[in-house]
Swiss-Prot record:
It is found in: Cytoplasm. It comes from Natronomonas pharaonis (strain ATCC 35678 / DSM 2160 / CIP 103997 / JCM 8858 / NBRC 14720 / NCIMB 2260 / Gabara). Pathway: Porphyrin-containing compound metabolism; protoporphyrin-IX biosynthesis; 5-aminolevulinate from L-glutamyl-tRNA(Glu): step 2/2. Belongs to the class-III pyridoxal-phosphate-dependent aminotransferase family. HemL subfamily. Its main location: cytoplasm. Its EC number is 5.4.3.8. Its cofactor is pyridoxal 5'-phosphate. InterPro entries: 4pyrrol_synth_GluAld_NH2Trfase, Aminotrans_3, Aminotrans_3_PPA_site, PyrdxlP-dep_Trfase, PyrdxlP-dep_Trfase_major, PyrdxlP-dep_Trfase_small. GO terms for biological process: protoporphyrinogen IX biosynthetic process. This is Glutamate-1-semialdehyde 2,1-aminomutase. It is an enzyme of class 5 (isomerase). Keywords: Cytoplasm, Isomerase, Porphyrin biosynthesis, Pyridoxal phosphate.
């Protein structure tokens, strides 16, 4: 493949953008990333005219692929032509909120913002105000946006900021615990329960190698929060309206969080975030309460129209059946390939998420119980050795994925996530043929 166009654009970008990009993950692979020109269904065409099967899908927002359905396109164009924004409330905000509240059981009220980061920042502030406490429990290695409260590393006894520019005092109010370890969570509650405002957790660790929860884990977190008067916050920025359909991952796992953060799909491909939950908490945001929250572009009419029409399309068409079936085909096909070529690796994912984690092991392949992606099943021959937390994913061959595997996939005409941690995403515009070609590319690249 010729990549001179991308190389040239990257050289230009380096002179005006830090690292040549506007989000760090986009800089992969080095020495230069692929620059997109336009999307086409489940594919992307780059600056040199190369066509790729695209499993990045904007890192999650594009459940319907790169082509907007006719009604979605019409709604967006209509809103833009009527004046893109007003600085005043509009009916489309109310309609979108009503749709979400009807379909997500735990959401009685919602506040729209502009990004997943903004949503989690606001959710943490809200939890602290509602409980009168300071500490937030998070999962080690998890990601909840570019915010000071959750950019931490270490463990409960030795926590530090994970980025330059964050005072140590911020980290002191955050307690990292391993995902899938209820005893570790219980221990920090026994030590700090009177000052824990909330537990903030992705129902599936989709930002850290798609780690699936063990049976009973979320129930344990729910019980701890109830026992100590803390709030349970589900970060569904990635899983929301993708895992578990319109009821989201909380519906799939039958868990009732107090607060949920949303992003990505809820905006139909446009910048968005949202904080939803019980009325007693959400109405504490200003102006009805004392927890300050505001934003010039919050509830942007174009974004609201795109998000609402996306969710309505999902409700009326076979979107979830289609993407989940292709996800199953990918995971099972990858399990067969990995068993033959790299049995120490782990196939992960659920619904329309998939990935291969380059785990190190003794070569024992995943069992039939986890052929459709690791489920932390005790019936699997690899139970207890597959990744159960972000730490396990970090211990995988992350460098080999970035240096060798992903560049080879690009040359095979397939775009997969930029690193070992981000998910791959199936869209409604992907086809069975895309799946077959992708599996063949994996055979070559592995």
């Amino acid at each position: 493949m010729n990549h001179e166009g991308s190389r040239s654009l990257y050289d230009r970008a380096l002179s005006v953008l830090p690292g040549g990009v506007n989000s760090a993950v986009r800089a992969a692979p080095q020495p230069y990333p692929v620059f997109a020109d336009h999307g086409d269904g489940g594919h992307v065409i780059d600056a040199d005219g190369n066509r790729y099967i695209d499993w990045i899908q904007g890192l999650g927002p594009l459940l319907l692929g790169h082509d907007m359905p006719e009604q979605l396109q019409a709604a967006v164009q209509s809103r833009a032509s009527e004046g893109p924004m007003y600085g005043m409330p509009s009916e489309i905000e109310v309609e979108h909120a009503e749709f979400v509240c009807r379909h997500v059981p735990s959401v009685e009220m919602i506040r729209f913002v502009n990004s997943g980061t903004e949503a989690t920042v606001s959710a943490c502030r809200l939890a602290r105000a509602a409980t009168g406490r300071n500490k937030i429990v998070v999962m080690q290695g998890g990601y909840h946006g570019a915010q000071e409260s959750t950019l931490v590393e270490g463990d409960a006894d030795d926590v530090a900021p994970s980025s330059a520019g964050i005072p140590q005092s911020f980290a002191e109010h955050t307690i990292p615990v391993p995902f899938n370890d209820p005893e570790a969570a219980s221990e920090v509650f026994r030590a700090h329960g009177d000052d824990i405002a909330a537990v903030l957790v992705e129902p599936v660790q989709a930002n850290m190698g798609i780690v699936y929860p063990e049976d009973g884990y979320h129930e344990a977190l729910r019980s701890l929060c109830d026992d100590y008067g803390s709030l349970l916050i589900f970060d569904e920025v990635i899983t929301g309206f993708r895992v578990g359909g319109l009821q989201c991952a909380q519906g799939k796992f039958d868990i009732d969080p107090d607060i949920t953060t949303f992003g990505k799909i809820i905006g139909g491909g446009f910048p968005v975030g949202a904080i939803g939950g019980k009325t007693e908490y959400i109405e504490q945001f200003t102006p009805s309460g004392d927890v300050f929250q505001a934003g010039t572009f919050s509830g942007h009419p174009v974004t609201m129209a795109a998000g609402l029409e996306t969710l309505k399309f999902c409700a009326e068409e076979d979107v979830y059946d289609h993407v989940n079936e292709l996800g199953r085909q990918l995971r099972e096909g990858l399990s067969d390939i990995v068993a033959d070529q790299a049995p120490e690796y782990t196939v992960v994912g659920t619904d329309s998420l998939f990935k291969v984690v380059f785990t190190r092991g003794d070569g024992t392949p995943q069992g039939e119980a986890c052929r459709n992606g690791c489920r932390q099943s005790s019936d699997c021959s690899r139970y207890g050795t597959c990744p159960t937390s972000a730490t396990d994913v970090r211990d995988a061959e992350t460098d080999r994925y970035a240096r060798l595997f992903r560049p080879k996939m690009i040359e095979e005409g397939v775009l997969v996530s930029q690193n070992q941690f981000e998910s791959n995403f199936v869209s409604y515009r992907h086809t069975a043929e895309d799946v077959e070609e992708t599996l063949e590319a994996y055979k070559e690249a592995l």
